[in-house]
Each structure stands twice: as structure tokens, then as C-alpha cells.
UniProtKB/Swiss-Prot annotation:
Reaction(s) the record says it catalyses: 2-C-methyl-D-erythritol 4-phosphate + NADP(+) = 1-deoxy-D-xylulose 5-phosphate + NADPH + H(+)
Protein name stated in the entry: 1-deoxy-D-xylulose 5-phosphate reductoisomerase
InterPro entries, per the entry: DXP_reductoisomerase, DXP_reductoisomerase_C, DXP_reductoisomerase_N, DXPR_C, DXPR_C_sf, NAD(P)-bd_dom_sf
Enzyme class: oxidoreductase
Family: Belongs to the DXR family.
Obligatory cofactor(s): Mg(2+); Mn(2+)
UniProt lineage: Bacteria, Bacillati, Actinomycetota, Actinomycetes, Micrococcales
MF terms in GO: 1-deoxy-D-xylulose-5-phosphate reductoisomerase activity; manganese ion binding; NADPH binding
Metabolic or biological pathway, per its Swiss-Prot or TrEMBL entry: Isoprenoid biosynthesis; isopentenyl diphosphate biosynthesis via DXP pathway; isopentenyl diphosphate from 1-deoxy-D-xylulose 5-phosphate: step 1/6
The encoding gene: dxr
The keyword NADP is assigned to this record: yes
UniProt keyword list: Isoprene biosynthesis, Manganese, Metal-binding, NADP, Oxidoreductase
Record organism: Pseudarthrobacter chlorophenolicus (strain ATCC 700700 / DSM 12829 / CIP 107037 / JCM 12360 / KCTC 9906 / NCIMB 13794 / A6)
Amino acid sequence: MQPRRIAILGSTGSIGTQAIDVVDGAPHLFEVVALSAGGGNLALLARQAVHTGAAAVGIAAGDPRELAVLIDEAAAAAGRSGYRPEIIAGPDASTRIAGLDADVVLNGITGSIGLAPTLAALKSGATLALANKESLIVGGSLVKAAARDGQIVPVDSEHSAIAQCLRSGSAAEVDKLVLTASGGPFRGRSGEELHGVTPQEALAHPTWDMGLMVTTNSATLVNKGLEVIEAHLLFDIPLDRIDVVVHPQSVVHSMVQFVDGSTIAQASPPDMRLPIALGLGWPGRVPNAAAPCDWTKAATWTFEPLDATAFPAVDLAKDAAKQGSTFPAVFNAANEEAVTAFHGGRIRFTDIVDTVDAVLSEHTGSSRLTVESVLDAESWARARAHERLAVSSL
């Protein structure tokens, strides 16, 4: 059997670097044919290109000539002089990489800029291993209409868990989905206690090692709100049948409750290499992708209700999803602006979700969901959030 040809979008980020680890551990199953990155770490991208032997490398920003020099230097150091991949540069580089000939496209880009690459990957016919939840959330019906059955395989640990659990019954037998949340670094704090939280504290996630935006979204639970919308779209389960529970140990990644009263859960130590491996190899499993639970050692798992008063983001996300249209895009864009302002020291931690709520309340939606209407709504949301943040700055 020939190895699956993999294109990795966002290769220098957390998902991308771990995906290369997965490929390294299973060279008989996978080979990397293309990489893309934003361009903020050209040296790492050059080393990745030489290491994987990718035929094409894309950068959204940065000097392609500098990248070519770095690749030559890395190739010489690795004893691979003469390796020269095609370099694709420009804002649409990831979209062009996504449209190349590959069996699987892993979209590990952060943010709604991943929408165009997601659509390009689906159009190409490749399986889409989706870590870029924002593209599905803001694209909604556009993304679903572009995908054939089974073409999108989730890489988020929660949705990967649900996909595995759903194999235990038919769609008609599913009662509800239960997404677990670690609770973030501020679990147990009241809304008042969250006012003085610093950016440094917000980035101290108790379980996962992620980028700035995703880590902050996990602290506000905006990320869990986005995951609820993603689960609703991926699995066609109504929002009122998707629950969120706090599970601080982050070993049970999500659960499916069936109509007979049984619950199937997926458990494993927190390690993103497992859902990444499943995304690349679905429906098969990759041996030794990650360490398993040690069932011979004593352990305690706890589950707690979500404090929706201190952390209103999940309910707010559900409301945006119920309204549909461009509301999820506005939710996401306003949040990204607010998170940037928070890390710039301009607003308080609790102002992030308050800003999202305020911008959503002013949005009227679009009569028809198109790529253009999504982009217009995002642009409006960012501008409106920016205006509100300028007024409410510390």
C-alpha cells in the first residue's frame, strides 16, 4: 500500500509540528508532499521542508528569496544539497497548497483565514483533516455543501472523540453529545474574580500547549463555544442536544449518550498527536500514535457543571449558531479583535466576551450565506469591535 500523501497547512504551528511528528513515526503510512505557513518562522519552515522532502512550500508573508536561501542552507547541513521545492508565496499560498494533488490536507491554520484553504481542499477531492474549526464555523452551510459524505475528518480532540464514539450506534440512536472542557486556568473563579486576570495568567493552560489565540479562547471558554457550533455542524445534532461538562483531568475527551441510556466515552492522556493521527489515517488507527492510559494505576476523574454565569461564552455561541447566517462569523471575528486588545493591555479579561456580546447584539445577519457575505460580516465585526474597544480601553 502506498503512503498517503499529506499536505500540512500551518506547519510551523502547534498542530503542524505535531503532525510532522506523527508522519515521522509512521513513514510507511504517510508522506508529506506540501507545507504552508504564515511566514513568521521561515527558518523552521525551511528545516521542515528539508526534513520531509516536501515538493511544494507556501508562505503567506515573508520573503520567498530568504526562504529559498534558508532551504539551501538546511539542505546542505542535512546532506541533501540539490533539494529545491517549489516555493509558493502570497496571501493565497495556503489556498494554492490546499488545491495541490494530495490524499489528505491537514488544515492547522488558526482563525477564519482558513476558510479559503478549507474550500480549496474540499474542491480538490482530498480528505480534509480539519483542525481549523473556524473555517467550518464561519463557513457553515458553504463548507458542508462543498464536502461529500465523510470528506471532513475532525482533528479537535473533542470532535475526534465524538467521531469515534458515534461508531457505536446509528444516527437515530444518538440522544446527545457531551463535550468535555478542562475549565481552563480559571476554573472555579467567579466573574468578579476574573476582572483582574492578566494576559500571562490567561496563557497558562493546565493541560494543552497551544498558540496565543486558542489558549486565550480556552481561558474564556470561547473555544468551547466554537466547539459546540463545530459539533452541531459536523454531526448534525441540534444545539439543545449538545452539552458541555467540566472535566479538569482532560482524559475523557468527549462522550456520546445513546437513547438506551448508555454513554460511550473516548479516553486517552492529553496528547494532540492521537487526534492528528486519526485525522490523517481515518478510518484506520496509527499504531503507537500516542501513549495510552495506564489502567493499573489509581486515578480519579471528576465532572462538574459549567458555570455559565462566570463563563457565558458557550451560551453566547449557541445563540449565534441558532441565529445562523453570518452570526457565527461575527462571534469569531469580534472575539479575535477583543483577544488582541486584551493581550495589548487595552482591556480587561472579562471585556473579551462582553465585547463579543455587544457586537452580536448589533448585527442583523445576511439574507444569503456566501464567501463574500462572510468576509463582509467579519470586516464589519472587526471594525465595530475596534470602535467599542477604543471607547472601553483601560
